């Protein structure tokens, strides 16, 4: 019975909120690029694009796992997780672009950071026996759990918060400070979301998975909107 509830909960989390979030993020991308397709708006749009692609991959993976499980599920989950984690590098690059301006933070430097970030997460995702798929869902091993937490902390949490706070100190206008505060709160919620997701795929406690399964919806929508209304809307 618990397994059945968990399965239907997963389907609810996938079809209703995640499809809605893909539509919402697509709308935000459209608004940013229609207003001004400059370097900063393109960079931040990439964050929403890769998150949306990760969500779509996850939808497909859960559909196949539920109706026709097979070895291909692992590949879909691989891309879903990788695309989602890879998206956060564009937030870091976006902040650095605002902080150092395009004349100092060149496209070449941005590309190097994006490439290094992608390689680091690709190596982690290829970790031997790091992820297994009992009962048609991904389960992280303890070594993988530790490595993922360390990598996310080093690659996003520390630089994301540090450079955001540095950027806030540079702003003198109170309205800009308020908007950047919303942006920072959005980043903080995204950080909580990712750490929770890593734990969600590691700790197989039904109560935690049910509660956090619903929390994911609130955290992802809130973080996405706060990041947009904080800095993305006025690019």
Q: What are these model-predicted stretches?
A:
Residues 40-41, 103-113, 140-148, 164-189:
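Membrane-helix boundary/juxtamembrane motif in polytopic membrane proteins
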Residues 3-20, 120-165, 210-212:
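Extracellular-loop-to-transmembrane junctions of the mid-late helices
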Residues 18-32:
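N-terminal signal-anchor/start-transfer transmembrane helix
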Residues 4, 28-38:
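Short, hydrophobic transmembrane alpha-helix segments
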Residues 60-69, 125-137, 195-205:
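Juxtamembrane "helix-exit" motif on the non-cytosolic side of transmembrane helices
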Residues 51-56, 115-127, 188-196:
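Aromatic-anchored segments of alpha-helical transmembrane domains
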Residues 8-22, 41-104, 108-118, 149-153, ...:
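Individual alpha-helical transmembrane segments in multi-pass integral membrane proteins
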Residues 155-235:
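C-terminal transmembrane-bundle signature of multipass membrane proteins
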């Amino acid at each position: 019975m618990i397994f059945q509830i968990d399965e239907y909960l997963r389907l609810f989390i996938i079809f209703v909120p995640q499809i809605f979030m893909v539509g919402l993020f697509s709308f935000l991308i459209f608004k940013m690029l229609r207003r001004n397709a400059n370097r900063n708006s393109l960079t931040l749009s990439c964050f929403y694009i890769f998150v949306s692609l990760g969500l779509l991959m996850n939808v497909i993976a859960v559909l196949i796992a539920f109706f026709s499980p097979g070895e291909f599920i692992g590949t879909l989950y691989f891309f879903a997780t990788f695309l989602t984690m890879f998206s956060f590098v564009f937030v870091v690059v976006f902040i650095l672009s605002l902080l150092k301006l395009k004349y100092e933070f060149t496209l070449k430097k941005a590309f190097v950071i994006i490439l290094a970030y992608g390689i680091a997460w690709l190596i982690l995702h290829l970790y031997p026996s790091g992820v297994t798929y009992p009962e048609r869902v991904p389960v992280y091993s303890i070594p993988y759990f530790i490595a993922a937490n360390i990598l996310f902390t080093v690659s996003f949490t520390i630089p994301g918060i540090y450079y955001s706070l540095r950027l806030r100190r540079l702003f003198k206008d109170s309205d800009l400070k308020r908007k950047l505060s919303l942006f920072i709160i959005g980043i903080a919620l995204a950080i909580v979301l990712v750490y929770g997701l890593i734990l969600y795929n590691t700790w197989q406690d039904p109560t935690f998975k049910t509660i956090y399964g619903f929390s994911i919806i609130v955290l992802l929508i809130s973080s996405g909107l706060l990041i947009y209304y904080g800095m993305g809307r006025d690019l």
